[in-house]
Regions:
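Mid-to-C-terminal alpha-helical segments outside catalytic/metal-binding sites
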Residues: 2-26, 36-41, 60-81, 245-246, ...
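Cleavable N-terminal signal peptides
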Residues: 30-31
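Mid-domain alpha/beta scaffold segments of enzyme catalytic cores
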Residues: 35-164, 202, 238
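Active-site metal-binding loops of divalent metal-dependent hydrolases
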Residues: 43, 197, 261-262
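N-terminal cationic-hydrophobic initiation segments that often serve targeting/anchoring roles
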Residues: 74, 101, 105, 184-185, ...
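Short beta-strand segments
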Residues: 84-86, 113, 223-226, 257-259, ...
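Hydrophobic packing residues within well-ordered alpha-helices of enzyme cores
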Residues: 97, 180-183, 278
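Catalytic pocket-lining loop regions of alpha/beta-barrel enzymes
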Residues: 148-257
Length: 306
């Protein structure tokens, strides 16, 4: 497999919870407190449907994670809009996500996947952008199987992404950040979003400096998601909050964004907790910080209509 495959566990860990999470709601008074709309920049959806088959060789998820289930969660938790990320179950077949975007054009935006080992990937990205996608995701793993990130096919793909003015999103371990920086040196104004704090281990905090080094590029953003998966503690995951605190001190709230990573989160925590940990339990954030990290930063990258 050419890219990171950690999400293949979804079929077994999420299957028992996807159908029940919709009941998790927040207090109405809390929902009314914010004067901005909350936007979730990282969610996956899929459905067992012969019209949109899962990719060969991928582990088939036990249950669906449908847009309709997601819409219920969003309503219950006061989330207005969501950015949908192409899930690994379909690999580079983006048709189900394209179908979903056509169904709910005012609520969702989509980030596609292209095959990083295909020389035609830049043209595929152009075609997908014409279809309405607003970004592409690459996921190089930490071992030799992910070394394509340093190969000759990357500069043309990154250049096309920059020309199309759509964000590149990167799922990669923190050890890959220096290689990401080398690609950014050639396109320093390009919009790049690093997923999940580069999954920096909480017991190796010095490794976060590899991610912090990307601060010098003005359009690099970081999702502070995965506090729940990186932590060795129960909610509110104070050990992984320390990573967020350092990123907040260096990047500032204008370049950080929260995310649920639903339904992956349901193997460990609740959809609502991905929101409340930022909104209620990161005590080092003030109200203005939260307005950026829950809303305005995301709109810098993925602007939604009013």
């Amino acid at each position: 497999m050419s890219d990171i495959s950690r999400r293949t566990f979804v079929g077994t860990t999420v299957g028992t919870t996807v159908g029940t999470a919709i009941g998790t709601a927040l207090a109405p008074a809390t929902l009314a407190a914010a004067d901005y709309r909350i936007i979730d920049p990282h969610v996956h959806v899929w459905k067992h449907d012969p019209e949109f088959p899962f990719a060969q060789g991928q582990k088939v998820p036990a249950r669906d994670a449908t847009p309709e289930t997601l819409l219920g969660l969003m309503k219950s938790n006061g989330v207005s809009k969501t950015v949908l990320i192409q899930v690994i179950h379909y690999r580079y077949d983006n048709r189900f996500l394209a179908h979903t975007l056509k169904q709910y054009p005012k609520t969702f935006k989509g980030v596609c996947r292209v095959d990083p080992l295909d020389p035609a990937a830049p043209d595929h990205l152009s075609q997908l952008t014409e279809q309405g996608f607003r970004g592409v995701r690459l996921s190089p793993g930490s071992g030799p199987v992910g070394d394509w990130i340093t190969g000759p096919l990357m500069p043309p793909l990154w250049k096309r992404c920059s020309e199309l003015k759509v964000p590149m999103t990167i799922l990669a371990p923190v050890v890959r950040m220096p290689e990401i920086a080398q690609l950014m040196e050639k396109l320093p104004e390009m919009t790049l979003v690093i997923d999940h704090m580069a999954d920096c281990p909480v017991d190796q905090p010095q490794e976060l400096e590899k991610l912090i080094a990307l601060k010098r590029f003005p359009n690099v953003f970081v999702k502070i998601s995965h506090t729940w998966s990186l932590s060795h503690q129960p909610y509110p995951w104070l050990d992984s909050q320390e990573l967020v605190k350092r990123l907040h001190a260096t990047f500032g709230p204008q370049r950080l964004m929260w995310a649920t990573d639903w339904p992956i989160i349901e193997s460990v925590a609740k959809y609502s907790q991905a929101l409340t940990v930022v909104r209620d339990d990161m005590k080092f954030l003030n109200a203005d910080d939260k307005s950026w990290m829950l809303s305005k930063t995301i709109e810098r990258v993925w602007p939604f209509p009013a």
